[in-house]
Every structure is written in C-alpha cells, then in structure tokens.
C-alpha cells in the first residue's frame, strides 16, 4: 500500500503546527543531543555552545529537516518514491560522519517533536505518516551516501 491522501493530509496539518512555534526547533535538537550527545559536533550551530540555544541557523536547519520530510510525504503520495532535491545531501552526511544509528535518533526526535507540536491531535496514524515519510527521506539520503 502506498502513501495515502489521508497520511499526506496528516503530515501537512502537523507541519503547519510545527512551523507556528520556533521553540519546536530547539526541542528537536535538545532531544537529539539527549539521545546522542556526541552528535553535537555534527551541527555547526551547536558545537560551540554548552546547550541548545535558539539561533537563525538552528531554526533554518530544523525547518529544512522537517520541510524535507514534509516534501517526502508529498512525493510518496504522488509517485511512491522520494527523490532528493539537493544532490549534495549524501556527501554532506558522509562528511559529517553520519551513520545508520544517527538516522534512528533523528527519527525519534522528529516524532517526539511532532507529538509535542500536535498536542491532542497526536495519534498512531499521525505518527505512522511521519515515520513513513521520514523513512522515505532517510532511504534516499542513505542511497546518495553510497
């Protein structure tokens, strides 16, 4: 079964909730560093600070990550596959030392952040929609890394 219209709608509506509150970007990176403290050095906007501090670069990167997952949902619904819009993503992830467990940490942080942003609208169905969209994106990035 492919990505459904309802799944796309769930991702779209919760993406809008995420974008409305910049504090969700800080939450996202706080969760990542709680799960994988060593990942701090992978992010230029985090490596020189003692804790996660809001900044334009942090906001831009979080919006890019969540935006790419959102775009993946649209692509999965339209064509059943995710094609990276940025051909350098594989090389960037290699350069930063990203390995499979990092993708799991980011997925968990993404889902926890969307759960917080969605509030009472959170459901297993919503979680699954984001998870499938993220897995599509992660798979495309991993493919570009090889």
Swiss-Prot record:
Which residues take part in binding heme b? 44, 64, 93, 96
Cystine links in this protein are none
Please describe the post-translational modifications of this protein: Nitrated in effective nodules and particularly in hypoxic conditions; this mechanism may play a protective role in the symbiosis by buffering toxic peroxynitrite NO(2)(-). Nitration level decrease during nodule senescence.
Q: Where is the Globin domain?
A: 2-146
- Phosphoserine modified-residue sites: 44
Which domain of life does this protein belong to? Eukaryota
Q: Kindly state the subunit structure of this protein.
A: Monomer.
The identity of this protein, by name, is Leghemoglobin Lb120-34
Source organism of the structure: Pisum sativum (Garden pea)
């Amino acid at each position: 079964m492919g990505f459904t219209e309802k799944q796309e709608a769930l991702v779209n509506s919760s993406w809008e909730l995420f974008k409305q509150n910049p504090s969700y970007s800080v939450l996202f990176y706080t969760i990542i560093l709680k799960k994988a403290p060593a990942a701090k050095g992978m992010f230029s906007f985090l490596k020189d600070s003692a804790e996660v501090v809001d900044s334009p670069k942090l906001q831009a990167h979080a919006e890019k990550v969540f935006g790419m997952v959102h775009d993946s949902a649209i692509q999965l619904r339209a064509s059943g596959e995710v094609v990276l819009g940025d051909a350098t993503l594989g090389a960037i992830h290699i350069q930063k030392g990203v390995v499979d467990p990092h993708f799991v940490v980011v997925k968990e942080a993404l889902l926890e952040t969307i759960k917080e942003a969605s509030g009472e609208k959170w459901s297993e169905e919503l979680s699954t929609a984001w998870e499938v969209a993220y897995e599509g994106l992660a798979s495309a990035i991993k493919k570009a890394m090889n």
